[in-house]
């Protein structure tokens, strides 16, 4: 069963990555832009497959965050270079075509464009319990959003 789910996620990446890459990365200052690209129940009862692109202008970053508690995530770098760190692991820079995964409940402490001059984009594929959400919840500091 797990192999079928992994295969479905990889097929989604293969299908969605070229379409997501065809759209230019939005340039809106230093904020990452998240664009939903896929949301479909699976043939596994109670599970859904969702995908988003995350576009980073040069030097942009995402706030530290958590994802939906049930979500297993596979990320694929479409363009540029993405610096990522999940709590407890060393930070790493991923380049075009590279992937990483995040286990359910992981705390994503770093997610940013590794370049100050070039945009970057990733595709994140979520396998999660149907109805679980939101997909991403940013951390807060003293009840204020991270900046």
Q: Can you say where each PLM-predicted feature lies in the sequence?
A:
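Short, flexible surface segments
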Residues: 58, 79, 96-97, 104
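Extracellular/periplasmic catalytic domains that process cell-envelope and extracellular macromolecules
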Residues: 43-47, 68, 76, 93, ...
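A short, N-terminal "cap"/entry segment at the start of jelly-roll beta-barrel domains
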Residues: 2-7, 14-50, 91-93, 100, ...
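Short, solvent-exposed loop/turn elements at domain surfaces
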Residues: 62-65, 85, 133-136
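Conserved hydrophobic/aromatic beta-strand scaffold that supports enzyme active sites
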Residues: 51-53, 74, 99-101, 124
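Glycine- and acidic-residue-biased ligand/ion/polar-headgroup-sensing regions
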Residues: 70-88, 98
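Ligand-binding loop in jelly-roll beta-barrel domains
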Residues: 83, 90-91, 104-133
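Conserved short histidine dyad/triad with adjacent acidic residue
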Residues: 50-68, 90-91, 103-107
